[in-house]
Amino acid sequence: MDFKAIAQQTAQEVLGYNRDTSGWKVVKTSKKITVSSKASRKFHGNLYRVEGIIPESPAKLSDFLYQTGDRITWDKSLQVYNMVHRIDSDTFICHTITQSFAVGSISPRDFIDLVYIKRYEGNMNIISSKSVDFPEYPPSSNYIRGYNHPCGFVCSPMEENPAYSKLVMFVQTEMRGKLSPSIIEKTMPSNLVNFILNAKDGIKAHRTPSRRGFHHNSHS
């Protein structure tokens, strides 16, 4: 399997979502974060778009989102986030296990995702992810194996203040199992808002002087 080609194609799809301005319906706004959705073309579910402002430069924000080491210290939606295969300095495969949601009505899922960071002109960075088959990590009876259709983060500088970033996140997750779509549609917008808030808190915590290894981890 040509993982690098898949990664590059996924980044291109995320860039396309970012340029697509038609058909989005706002489903939640909270604390200056906006969640919109439209029908996914990949599966019978929604593609979500989440927008917020992060008080950090795009370069530092994208490094923060790309690194694996500290992810579960701030991302409260995950219980496991491990790199399982490094392809090159910009591309790796990770195994994640989510927490349960909706007071336990959505049980934990696990995912095997191909993650890729691509840097564009104008200080815009895209971190894309897409589920792949990876024989070393077959589905387990302990968790339902979910599937992420092309997802990602787009980090770009704010025109009026380049030290701040506009973060746009795209999510289209196929939970699988026996969930009704209505449960997912009710819980997903709040979970996405919480992710942005958790990321803001995580970045704040990383601004303390004890940042040794921060950049090293993103390329280890």
Curated annotation (Swiss-Prot):
Entry annotated with the keyword Magnesium: no
InterPro entries for the chain: StARD5/6 (IPR043556), START-like_dom_sf (IPR023393), START_lipid-bd_dom (IPR002913)
Residue intervals of the START domain: 1-208
Keyword annotations of the record: Lipid transport, Lipid-binding, Transport
GO function term, MF aspect, one: lipid binding
Pfam annotation, one family: START
GO biological process: lipid transport
Tagged with keyword Lyase: no
Highest taxon listed in the record's lineage: Eukaryota
Function in brief: May be involved in the intracellular transport of sterols or other lipids. May bind cholesterol or other sterols.
PANTHER family membership: PROTEIN CBG07384, STAR-RELATED LIPID TRANSFER PROTEIN 6
Protein name: StAR-related lipid transfer protein 6
Native source organism of the sequence: Homo sapiens (Human)
